[in-house]
Amino acid sequence: MMSHSHYDPYNTDHSYATKVAMECRMIAQAWGHNPGEKVLGAPQLYLFEPHQSEQMQWKPDTFLDITDVWDKKRAAIECMQGQEHLWNFYTNLAENRGNHFRRNSGGMAGGRPARYAEGFQSVYPRTVDEL
């Protein structure tokens, strides 16, 4: 699941959408919420990066390599004619997150060569089999 940051003073509808996503997740994994119905499980909820991450109290903890789909993403961004001022902003951001991806996947020690990446903030703890 993906949604907006928890807090966004410029787009309050974004915060509301995240609250709805969190409620849907809660219901999907709640034993006894709807007796007789299958429990769907508890997927992670990732919050994608807002325009002003430092104002939204958003901190990335997950990076996704989007190099293979960057051209399509850039073309999609350019479809929003009213936000032309953000086209280069998002290109620069994807390149910066690509650097974060490379550094956190091993960097000079054999890290994966992502040119473009996106950052996400996970809401819930993740489970692992080993550290």
Predicted feature locations:
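Metal-dependent de-N-acetylase/amidase catalytic core
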Residues: 1-131
